[in-house]
Structures are given as structure tokens and as C-alpha cells.
Amino acid sequence: LEEGPYGKCVFHNDNDVVDHQVASLLFENGTTVAFTMCAFSDACDRTVKFMGTRGEIRASMDNNVIEVTQFGAGVRTGTTAVYTVKPGSTGHSGGDEGIMEEFVSILKGERENTNTIAQSVHSHVMAFAAEESRLTGRTVDVADFEKSVMA
């Protein structure tokens, strides 16, 4: 610890790992995404909120609850269904374990793989494009970025 990188203060070091990032994405079909990542917070929790024209979904890994609220024509505004989910016991609240279980099931022929390599590569390219935007301060067109990195 005294001589290696693990003994260095994370605040007074050459550490250049991003600790806060906001990315805005616009998809071809008009869907927008606002992604915020912050390493330093009183509540170190992963949360998601999906907002649509007829409802929204909110979830938090800390409270193991998914809330679905519907609104609009024919729906009583403010009606929320609450689903309690079993907390994960391994990395990423059980997500790592779930990925491995699905992978093994696919290898055993117990289920069909519905996720293509192309989908996986594209999702990674989007993350790399967000990082490129963070580093350069420019808006990045993902299609153009993908062409440049895949060439």
C-alpha cells in the first residue's frame, strides 16, 4: 500500500476515472434518454425512471420495489401498482448471476439466445460514444462514431 497505486489518495492522484457524467441520447424513432451517473452521493443507489405518454415506471435497487403508474384516457390518474422484487445477492444486485444463468441455459440448449452480438456491440459503441462526447465536449452522432471505430 505504501508504494503501489492502492495506497494513494483518490482525490490527490492521477486518477482520471469519470465520477460524474450526464449523457443525453436521441434515437431515430424520437425516443430520448437522459442518463446520469454520479459516484458520490449520500444514497449510493441505482435508480431508473421510464416516462411515457401513458405512464411511468420507477425502480430502485436499494428498496427492491418497482412502481408502475398509468395515466391518460381511461385510466384513473395516479393509480400506482407496486411490485416488490427479491433482492439480488451477488454483483449488480443479482444481474451478474442472472446473465451467467442465461448464458449457461443457452449453451445447454435450454433456451434460445435472443440477444445478438450486434446488439451487444452497438450498446458498447453507444457507451464509447458517450465517453467520446465527455472527453471532447462535442455532440457525437453514434452512427458516424460506429463507422469510424468499426472501420
Which residues are covered by each model-predicted region?
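Alpha-helix-centered segments that form part of catalytic cores
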Residues: 1-26
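C-terminal helical cap and adjacent loop that interface with cofactors, partners, or active-site loops
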Residues: 17-151
